[in-house]
Structures are given as C-alpha cells and as structure tokens.
C-alpha cells in the first residue's frame, strides 16, 4: 500500500462518503443477537432512577459501558468529526477509540494530519484509545506508534486486524505473515495496554487459540470482537475501489457478533472484552453484556450525528443509554454485574 499521506487522506474521505451515502451493512448476515432474549421480569425490585450503568475498562472508570468506536482520522473532515465525538464522550463519561493513526507515522506531511486526532482539549477525562493496523505494527514502527499515542494523549492502543478489508482495498497491505509475532513484540515494547480488534468481520475461537499458542501466552490486554452484522468493511472497500460489488460473497463474510462474544468469552473468561459490530440499540448492548462483554462500542450510527454537532452525537447516545437502563430495570438487574448473572435465553 502507498504510504503517501495525501493518498491516505483522500481514501479516508472516500470512506466517510461511502459510509454516509451507500448501503454498507451486511446483507443476509445479522449480529445473531436476535437469537437471544433478555429475560423480562414483571416483578422487578429495582428503581429505574437507581440503575447503575457504571463500568471500568483498562482501569478507567466509565459512567456507562460504552465506547465510541474507531471511525476516522487524516481527512479534512475528520478533525470536526472526532472533536464532536470526543465532546459527546466527555459529556457522557464514556470512552472513545480514534480512527487509524497510520498517517501520523509519516515524518513529513503526515504530521499535518495529526490535528485530526487532537481531541484532548475537548475531552480531558475520556478513556482515549489510539489505533494502528496489525499490518503496520512492525518492530521498527513501534517508536513512531508510541510517539503518535503520546501526541494525542492516548491511554491505550487498539490494533486492528483487517485482512479482508486490506484484500479488498486498492494497494492494500495483504502480507500478514509473521504478524502474530510482531504483535507480541510490540505489546512487550509499548507502555500501553493493547486492545486487539477486528473491523467488522469478527474475532472468534480460532484467532484466540492462535494468540494463546504464542510464547508467553496472550500478548494483548483485551479483545474487541468487532463481529459481523453491522458495517461490512469488505463492502465499503469494494464500493470505494470499484463503485460496485465485484465480490458479493466476500462482502457478507464474517463471524456474527453474538457468536464472537460467546467464543471469545469462553476462551478468555477474565480478559477485558468489547462487543462491537452492529450494536445499534440499548437492547443490543444489554444482550451483549449479558453474553459476557464488559463494554460495547458503537461507530457508524454516530457518523452522521458527528458531522452535525457534538450535541447530535450526545442526543443519539443518550437515547441508547436510556434504553439500556430500562433493559436492566425490567429484567431486574440493578447493575451490570447483575445483568451478566441473569444472562440471556437462547431462542430455539
């Protein structure tokens, strides 16, 4: 792939346009959350006003179990989007992931793009997670990655594994050989918690087994399953590259979010776990947490509000959180721990 910051910036803008204007959801593939029912308790003994949504992730307190998912950075429009997202996160006491910071690794023109990730001024207290691609995470790149994280004031690093997206992208990084070893080495060298994530095609049992076979065991501090059922980045990249779907079967390939949550939680009972990929409602969040996730992440539904204003983002998220609170109340869970204890019922 080209390392030209101008080309990266142009592609980022095309990503935004396609996600706003085209149908980029999976077709015929769902999150799988509809196959579970949150038990309804007609005799709940909770008070809606007293429901406690507070959570903790990577040692940071959150007023609700929500992260704003990784979206953008490097395009001219990205700065406004990220500042509006970060402002809403600060107001609501939730976390935020930045979009890929690859463009910041360039020594020259890439530095101009760094301003699109600069959100600490409006979000001084937010759990802020930086972002780099697994394909770019070489040992030689670690000092530049660390510098990029320091520059934005990040608390942690998300490393996105996106082999299918890269395969669909013009000039994409398609050599992932040795990437597990590089991930282990980078995690050892970086003084930040590392969150391994997909981009919407899912992390499941097979990937976790590969991680656990590495010398020293699991090299990361947490997993974001980023499952199938929401935005398909294989679909996005095909639309950006060709203006149409050349490979429709590849546009709808992935591990559904619910399946990914269950598989990863079974393999890693105590590791911080993010549920993302098609999380659209408070009920989706409640089911995901009941299945074992610690927090959920939401991305594309916030893109259009973020172009409008921070208040529009806040309003969207407040409705989401209000629904989540009612879900806990009406299943008799005063807090998130109780929600996990109650669990969900599989629909046969």
Swiss-Prot record:
Annotated binding of FMN, by residue: 70-72, 100, 131, 197, 231, 278-280, 299-300
InterPro entries per UniProt: Aldolase_TIM, FMN-dep_DH, IPdP_isomerase
Main subcellular localisation: cytoplasm
SMART domains listed in its UniProt record: IMPDH
Gene3D superfamilies according to UniProt: Aldolase class I
Binding site for substrate: 11-12, 100-102, 165
Keywords (A to Z) from UniProt: Cytoplasm, Flavoprotein, FMN, Isomerase, Isoprene biosynthesis, Magnesium, Metal-binding, NADP
GO cellular component, one term: cytoplasm
Function per UniProt: Involved in the biosynthesis of isoprenoids. Catalyzes the 1,3-allylic rearrangement of the homoallylic substrate isopentenyl (IPP) to its allylic isomer, dimethylallyl diphosphate (DMAPP).
UniProt subunit comment: Homooctamer. Dimer of tetramers.
HAMAP family for the chain: Idi_2 (MF_00354)
This protein's name: Isopentenyl-diphosphate delta-isomerase
The organism of origin for this protein: Mycobacterium ulcerans (strain Agy99)
Gene that this sequence comes from: fni
């Amino acid at each position: 792939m080209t390392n030209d910051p101008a080309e990266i910036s142009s592609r980022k803008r095309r990503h935004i346009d396609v996600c706003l204007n085209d149908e980029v959801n999976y077709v015929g593939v769902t999150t799988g959350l509809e196959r579970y029912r949150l038990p309804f308790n007609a005799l709940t003994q909770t008070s809606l006003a007293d429901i406690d949504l507070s959570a903790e992730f990577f040692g940071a307190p959150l007023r609700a179990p929500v992260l704003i998912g990784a979206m953008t950075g490097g395009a001219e429009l990205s700065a406004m989007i990220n500042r509006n997202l970060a402002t809403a996160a600060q107001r609501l006491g939730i976390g935020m992931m930045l979009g890929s910071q690859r463009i910041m690794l360039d020594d020259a023109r890439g530095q101009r793009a760094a301003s699109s990730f600069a959100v600490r001024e409006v979000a001084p207290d937010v759990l802020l997670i930086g972002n780099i691609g697994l394909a770019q995470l070489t040992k030689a790149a670690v000092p530049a990655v660390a510098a990029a994280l320091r520059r934005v004031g990040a608390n942690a690093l998300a490393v996105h594994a996106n082999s299918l997206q890269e395969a669909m992208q013009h000039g994409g990084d398609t050599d992932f050989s040795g990437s597990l070893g590089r991930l282990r080495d980078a995690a050892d060298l970086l003084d930040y918690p590392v969150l391994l994530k997909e981009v919407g095609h899912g992390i499941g049992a097979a990937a976790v087994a590969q991680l656990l076979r590495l010398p020293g065991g699991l090299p990361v501090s947490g997993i974001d399953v980023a499952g199938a059922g929401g935005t398909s980045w294989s679909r996005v990249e095909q639309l950006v590259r060709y203006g149409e779907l050349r490979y429709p079967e590849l546009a709808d390939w992935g591990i559904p979010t619910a399946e990914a949550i269950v598989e990863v939680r079974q393999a890693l009972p105590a590791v911080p776990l993010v549920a993302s990929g098609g999380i659209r409602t408070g009920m989706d969040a409640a089911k995901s947490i009941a299945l074992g996730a610690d927090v959920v992440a939401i991305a594309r539904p916030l893109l259009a509000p973020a172009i409008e204003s921070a208040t529009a983002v806040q309003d969207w998220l407040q409705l989401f959180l209000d629904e989540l609170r009612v879900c806990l109340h009406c299943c008799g869970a005063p807090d998130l721990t109780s929600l996990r204890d109650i669990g969900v019922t599989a629909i046969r």
